[in-house]
Amino acid sequence: MQKYISEARLLLALAIPVILAQIAQTAMGFVDTVMAGGYSATDMAAVAIGTSIWLPAILFGHGLLLALTPVIAQLNGSGRRERIAHQVRQGFWLAGFVSVLIMLVLWNAGYIIRSMQNIDPALADKAVGYLRALLWGAPGYLFFQVARNQCEGLAKTKPGMVMGFIGLLVNIPVNYIFIYGHFGMPELGGVGCGVATAAVYWVMFLAMVSYIKRARSMRDIRNEKGTAKPDPAVMKRLIQLGLPIALALFFEVTLFAVVALLVSPLGIVDVAGHQIALNFSSLMFVLPMSLAAAVTIRVGYRLGQGSTLDAQTAARTGLMVGVCMATLTAIFTVSLREQIALLYNDNPEVVTLAAHLMLLAAVYQISDSIQVIGSGILRGYKDTRSIFYITFTAYWVLGLPSGYILALTDLVVEPMGPAGFWIGFIIGLTSAAIMMMLRMRFLQRLPSAIILQRAAR
């Protein structure tokens, strides 16, 4: 029992800074929306539309680079720190190549925006302008993620938290300058949010690099000599590990986007209630997602040390802590669902629907916690392909079709509206949780030599 308590303390010490960093990141998006809304409703809508395209694109790159964390954690645990610098350099090359692709996609996103049904031309122009300003921040964001993943792979999660809050503090005044045109800058409205956010991502990257260059704990890595040229073999391995994670993230984000589109014809009350419940459950998701990042680090580190039993302990502890957290957040959601809904909207119909959907959200919080922490465990074992297959099957083969049938057809019951999609979420997330656990048990039952060989790839 003592070993689980000790492991839980280590996991929470790693996870809490990640939680705070994620809160800072979420707050940046909130600040952009509020400040653009203060300028005009059209500008706020433009930022929302632009963000809905930016997120899937940048999260694809983000997911690809998540492969670095278990690689570095495993090298750190095995005492092969002299190889870390080379992996990080290749991570920067990969981030650079992916940035170019993302920037090309975002530059041409106007075709998608202008093809939206009944979109106002002025709104479309502002959304395109926002994206074309924001896309210059894509390299800065991905370079920052490489540096952050280096730190987190070495069990240093506080720097990412600090840089996140630096970014938030810089974002507010820079937004103000470019939205309203102060200090000689042009008045850009919502487009100014894109300029400001792009600049902030570069500030965060440069601040993180400054920390890494000064950190005593990374002196040996910093001083390691090696080629700065692209290494196709290393980059191929990073892509093999990272691409399934990137695709899983992409399909998860697009799932919720598709559901939002399917709910939109049902009416304002249904759309508003669905959005409130989804926004709140997204905030609660920060907790298990951050714990999953910590579990990846601990499992990778223990496997690097050659201890499959300690890796199992880290995995089981992560799941136990995650279930405890999810139970508490579910109780909180059920107890205060109406008060939470009132923070978003005071329309009685919207509040009633949102409160009902939050009950369903509370049901799936435990499944959601298990599946996301399970994904973190599998990343630690470098078993990333299974994450993609499980996520795609659970969300797109089981969850979305079930939700569609329940919400919009009478094949099983009378059309349930948004609640049907939320039951679909429960089916999808519960299926993902079960499959993640089965895969984890399969891996952990392999001979230790095979587990360690797979982890050392």
From Swiss-Prot:
Residues 1-10, 74-92, 148-159, 210-242, 297-313, 371-386, 439-457 are cytoplasmic. One of its GO terms (molecular function) is xenobiotic transmembrane transporter activity. It is found in: Cell inner membrane. It is a multi-pass membrane protein. GO terms for biological process: sodium ion transport; xenobiotic transmembrane transport. Keywords: Antiport, Cell inner membrane, Cell membrane, Ion transport, Membrane, Sodium, Sodium transport, Transmembrane, Transmembrane helix, Transport. The keyword Transport applies. GO terms for cellular component: plasma membrane. The chain crosses the membrane at residues 11-31, 53-73, 93-113, 127-147, 160-180, 189-209, 243-263, 276-296, 314-334, 350-370, 387-407, 418-438. It holds the Pfam family MatE. Its main location: membrane. CDD domains: MATE_NorM_like. Residues 32-52, 114-126, 181-188, 264-275, 335-349, 408-417 are periplasmic. Multidrug efflux pump that functions probably as a Na(+)/drug antiporter. Belongs to the multi antimicrobial extrusion (MATE) (TC 2.A.66.1) family. MdtK subfamily. This is Multidrug resistance protein MdtK. It comes from Escherichia coli O1:K1 / APEC.
